[in-house]
């Protein structure tokens, strides 16, 4: 047989000349349905691609994508649980099944449908033209627990002739292989099963003995057939029979089984011709071998896929019966008879292979041209997009530059305006300084003559004396139509030294909301004029001098904060800090709204800072301590050194007096004793009950702060600005909240809000001719029947009414406050 193929070389040109016309190759195709089993994995994409390559060129082909969904036996609930399907839930289960099937189609099968519906390039061999077609696609989702049973039932029910399933190359011993074998054994004889795997494509078809046959490559099958016949010539069937009998297992099992595969793969008519000569056999065999060598493995596998060879079903029975004769005992005679009587078939095979090669060459040329055109189109699109991108970037760059230029101009203009304003301000300040330098410096307080002081105080009348101090007496006076307080220093303290002039000049410039304002002075006689404080001193109010009203607790907390803020201002004053030295309740004055202001600042001590840029103060040493005994710093009494912590000690004593309403003598010991056991009852016993209901937590916090301020050593006392003032600010918020809640309580209207006729608050107050105020409606009704005053009963001179806007505004304010 080898000599037959070697000596029968057929010239390719002669083979091409013997090819039939292209019009003979274009046979009309019948409608065909190809079923594809889709699992959703990457193997399904391989199945789709293979099916498109094999059947996608047919016009009347329909792809039916089949997916097997596990049988639904449970239903999900709204709470996230699942329930079994019963007869009562059958309608709900049907709706749920329909929803699941539809979602499966949308999410799993739709992407594969889009792959199938892509446009395919089809070559018309008769006209050498190309056209674009679409593959029709149907989606089918089946519900079953057995994939093989469901697919087999669908194929047999709809008489599907082609079934394509996927399988991995390692799946021979897995469950996937069992499914494939089960499907192949169960489908009808009219259906051809294609198994697409990584190793190739297997065609499974049923023969008369229901055995499975695999075909991975037509070329490999043909080579195996050729090798089985290479032991002798084509006509010498006895030699072939002896070879088969000498080794029946290898030849019968391996080679003879491939013979039906060859015939099925090429799908040619099984016509018998006994008149063919040996030379013709050799030529046809060599031509077939040459065609097999020139075609690629992919082309060899594709021989059985060409629509021109779809007559395999017509000859399946004949091939199956021929394949069944290859048994161990009957090998030699059928094989020899086949090669002897079917030389025409081999000749036909070589012709068809040549035609197939020519068709593949044309297809390859068309593919190359299509790819080249697509590549050129993509290049043109890419160049167009690149050009558009460059243009867009250029426009964006220009716009960005314009925007940056505009921002830069605006920024420069703003800087220019700011520089001009700054220069103008500096010029004005310079002019002011120059003007002030040309004029002799003046003191920043008003100077009063001694005669004005004497006249304002009625020659220092005892009736106008409102206070007495260690440095002088205080009188109430009226200077320039302004009520003020004049403090006249004793003769021993009125020497006008340079130090007094310096202190007077500096203190006249001090302005703080909680420091008594220095209005003026009479330097010749040592008189200082301050603003008048209506409610006197804190000491008088604490001890209720002249039966004055007690101060509520929330006002006391606010006073503590106000005094602390004034002390911080004095200690931070520039150029030299000021220490009060004589801070006590008698020197804290209250105005008509109980706003506290620290007085007697004019006789305080100014100390120099160690460094002009530093906030640390040097101790000031004075040989003779001044101040009130209970408020003097113990360290100052012992060493004569004074510092800002000296005022902190006096401030702590004032807080203790605000809490208890007692004298300062031994007050520290009393509060410490009450605070030792952390007993609220003991603390409440020492508090001033006239101040109202003290809040325990805030009161305990304030008492602890006061005890820290009264420590014997100054270094143990807290810092006024960093430690004391923040605590007092938080307590002030509590006090303000309590004051607001108290003022929000409804109050009784004043008597002048009432109408003399209605005995109720007036809505529209008006003044009548008798001078009294009435409600407009009430007085109008009165004057309709009377011409006398409702109050005096005297005749009314007229009936005119004048609106009392002032009283009306007061009534409206009272109503709003009490809503």
From Swiss-Prot:
It comes from the Eukaryota. It comes from Arabidopsis thaliana. Functions as an E3 ubiquitin ligase. Pfam families: Pkinase (PF00069), U-box (PF04564). Residues 748-819 form the U-box domain. ATP binds at residues 466-474, 487. The keyword Metal-binding does not apply. InterPro entries: Kinase-like_dom_sf, Prot_kinase_dom, Protein_kinase_ATP_BS, Rossmann-like_a/b/a_fold, Ser/Thr_kinase_AS, U-box_ubiquitin_ligases, Ubox_domain, Znf_RING/FYVE/PHD. Residues 223-237 have a biased composition (Low complexity). Residues 278-296 have a biased composition (Basic and acidic residues). PANTHER family: OS02G0152300 PROTEIN, U-BOX DOMAIN-CONTAINING PROTEIN 53-RELATED. The keyword Kinase applies. Keywords: ATP-binding, Coiled coil, Kinase, Nucleotide-binding, Serine/threonine-protein kinase, Transferase, Ubl conjugation pathway. It catalyses: L-seryl-[protein] + ATP = O-phospho-L-seryl-[protein] + ADP + H(+); L-threonyl-[protein] + ATP = O-phospho-L-threonyl-[protein] + ADP + H(+); S-ubiquitinyl-[E2 ubiquitin-conjugating enzyme]-L-cysteine + [acceptor protein]-L-lysine = [E2 ubiquitin-conjugating enzyme]-L-cysteine + N(6)-ubiquitinyl-[acceptor protein]-L-lysine. Belongs to the protein kinase superfamily. Ser/Thr protein kinase family. Residues 395-437 form a coiled coil. Pathway: Protein modification; protein ubiquitination. This is Putative U-box domain-containing protein 53.
